[in-house]
């Protein structure tokens, strides 16, 4: 097993030097030898996240990415969550800009929530951003339980993406078209096969029934005509719909919010035409031919939406923060068990969308990560069992390396000796740890693997059911190329195989 560790630490190093020089007369406690010790300690997150963006105050909720051709960058709007929201007014739309999905600049507040508890947009819900003829549009959800309709679709416009004007005279109300006034949200706009703008909205039929997508069309992004509805999957509410065409295929990315440990994941459907795409959701859904019902990531990646600069298409979602009295409670607080949900909001995570020759999708690392994580750090063996010259042998074999920094890129290759070998990567582990955390590459059968999150050790709970990944094909040569990126407490792991479906199609699994 060959391991390379890269780190981003220039800012941290600069801060340390400045602090050390602030007072020549001050002598603090002696520095602990973190590099030379292996016992457990509970680390804390920095105030802001640099790679998987999180504001210094509050957290990121449902992103709305958009490629701004006028400025040549991505604008990623999102719902700003605070720890202590007002009872009726919350989730103003904030934003960041990025050219590459790995480095961000804050835009601050883009669109405020309403001025009082009785305005329709006292609270804001997610939507989308579009540009036409020099005017930027934000279509968003106005949410207020004090109003006749709890949720309606609203819009705001801007000539420069800086000064926004809410259109107080325009709304789309679900009951006017036979839909629920309580659930009518998450508008998303795209150009369909008829070269008109189409908008889909997540909702329910008025009077009850399974959830559905309401559909509208427009020639000018101003006046909208209702053109019907299409199904969701049985009784599963599919939030944050996002429709796009990539090559010869149409896709609908959605977040399945059914309250069960096997649900609440970002998934996709695919078809050759837009009409066929809508039909994929009929009874007996036509899943993508990827073997895992279109699942793109774990339950720790939600509300994913995409944007393309014409070369690369990226998907942004949020990784939930975890609460608890200590690091061990936080690490397993993932909404395990049917009916439980992870915390809402967290850090902004970006992946590159990989399209395979059969049209199926997987997620890969953002290319700019390679240049961002560019300082090599020594990987020193601190303790081991059953380890010799890069080979681990026997049950319970492991190798423990030195501590990592705040942000890291860990790259290594594993070759297993047979089709049933099981291996993993552990974190928050010391030589004295009675419980620690491992992402396990688990054999599900002879030819399939799945990434599991486990609390191991003599006091560990074992498999954490609501944080596992999805099935993927075992590499034919049993060689796994693995890249892990960390930013504070956020971790993303990519598994690649050089013996994939066809040459070059080696991105097989992503796990946040």
How would you label these PLM feature ranges?
Residues 23-512:
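Carbohydrate-active catalytic/glycan-binding domains of CAZyme proteins
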Residues 1-8:
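Bacterial N-terminal signal peptides that target proteins for export
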Residues 12-15:
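Alpha-helical transmembrane segments
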Residues 17-20:
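C-terminal motif of bacterial Sec signal peptides marking the signal peptidase cleavage site
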